[in-house]
Amino acid sequence: VITTATDLNQKWAVDIFAKKNRLYIEDMKLAKLVSADILAGKQVLAEIEPECSVIGQIPKELKFIHESDRCDSRALKIHIGICKNDAPAGSGTQVLYLIPKAVVLGIGCKKGTAAEKIEKHVTQVLEEYGIFPEAVKLAASIDLKKEEPGLCTYCEKYDIPFQTFSKEELEQAEGTFTGSEFVKQTTGVDNVCERSAMCAGGEKILVHKTAHEGVTVAVAVEKWSVDFE
């Protein structure tokens, strides 16, 4: 109701903006508080992660700040991006996260690895680096793993599209990768997870190869943008 009111009053509406840009709203209660502040004539603080391209003019209802800026102790803040950036403890600042699907997971695993082990390691990596699971757009690996039961089960559970590439395609990936002679002997390419993430649309690697219990994971981010027009 409140977000509809912002639209009817020709003010910037967070839910419409999120829908247009395919952003996940992490907390609808905070979204309503943002809309209430805007209806009351207040400017809402907002920040966007540097990887994002901004299209159009920033609406007057928002005041953009840098992540390092100090906020009013009672302020609401919008954070647009894939990573958690909580306000300092005790600051009183509440953060509404708007999350794009811009993360690509590169995954490698030993044959027969259980889905639970894959899920456990992916979850640990995302949590360690503060990356929202809702930001994951797809997972990628080498074509040798196209029908790997554990990988397929994990992706199906979280409704994550799964894409695979031949070793020749992986070899063409541009960038600096964490090579392994053992992996090259096994798969024909020196690195599966990082190269897969880049081949699947990654613009840059956020998390290089991490390995645990036979599972390797890398995280890349695509180019992404938000449109205020």
Place the predicted regions along the sequence by residue.
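A generic local secondary-structure boundary/capping motif
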Residues: 29-37, 68-70, 92-96, 195-196, ...
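Cofactor- and metal-binding active-site motifs of prokaryotic enzymes
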Residues: 1, 8-19, 25-37, 59, ...
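C-terminal non-catalytic interaction/assembly regions of soluble proteins
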Residues: 117-124, 134-197, 201-217, 224-229
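Conserved mixed alpha/beta catalytic, RNA-binding, or beta-rich assembly cores of soluble enzyme
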Residues: 1-24, 37-146, 150, 220-222
